[in-house]
Amino acid sequence: MDALTTYPGSITHRQPLFRLSAHPTHHRIMNVTVDPNALAVFLADVRDIDVQNLQYVPFMRHHLADLLVERLGDDFADMLVELVKDRRHGGFTIGLQDLSQDPSDFVKFGTAIGHILGPSNHDAMSGTYYARFVVKHTDNSDSYLRQAYRLFTMHTDGTYVSDATDWLLMMKFAEQNALGGESRFLHLDDWEERDRFVNHKLGTRPFFYKGSDSKNVSEQIERPLFFQSEFGLSISFIDQFVQPSNREETAFLRALSRSMEASAGTKEVSLPVGGLVVLNNYFYLHGRAPFQPNESLVRELMRQRGSFAY
């Protein structure tokens, strides 16, 4: 078996209530399939927990994680954490398998998955621990997030906030008349020109980041592009919010961004409605391909970001 699809040592390849398999379109992230009966019981368990309760009471989010682990076992939780921390993989996809179309169930399932990894960050854009947003034909926002027909360039999350952003979760809530718009992922170790930028004199020099007005974050953060973390070589970058101070820095950042976009290691991944993806934010960059123009285009997504509990 290829080293990139070898399962982490403590992970059992097949369990009665869940199955781990290679992702059909990405050579690193894995696909997790859960027994639908166990998943249906979890949805019944959380039926009377309302979303506002989750927004107001942080421990209820962890309670959802406990309820999911009760149905699927500690091995399931250990597997998810290990997948995201393992540099060979660093992420997974999982979904509700058409068991529900209720957005509240999507929030609860995504919250349970995220809080198996650890606590979520406050999302200043939405004012709570997650953000839901719609991409459609027209948009007048001040960032690429909702702009359907632009390339949403490769980036990491959490660049302009002081909170640790260890993991990122994105879940598809709805989609109509959408062609294109695939998620794009780049693992640092698959970027052919990485070392050219790491070894540049600006590669580890701090840059300032400042979010746009819609992000509702006033602080300005200074951080290097490349750095060492517990996961090895790591990156923090977003072209929209980094603030170069001269033409040399501008040329370097522009070349870095263009190199990532053109890399053969940048792969497209599609999600079904009710599906989600989790990535390690230290060594994955992510973006989105442009949609094909359609006046009736709608895609709704949920974002959660957080830190590892252990």
What residue ranges belong to the model's regions?
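Active-site environment of non-heme Fe oxygenases that use a 2-His-1-carboxylate facial triad
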Residues: D2-L72, F76, D86-G91, R132-V273, ...
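N-terminal functional module of multi-domain proteins
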Residues: G73-S120
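Long, hydrophobic, well-ordered secondary-structure blocks that form the structural core
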Residues: S100-Q147, T153
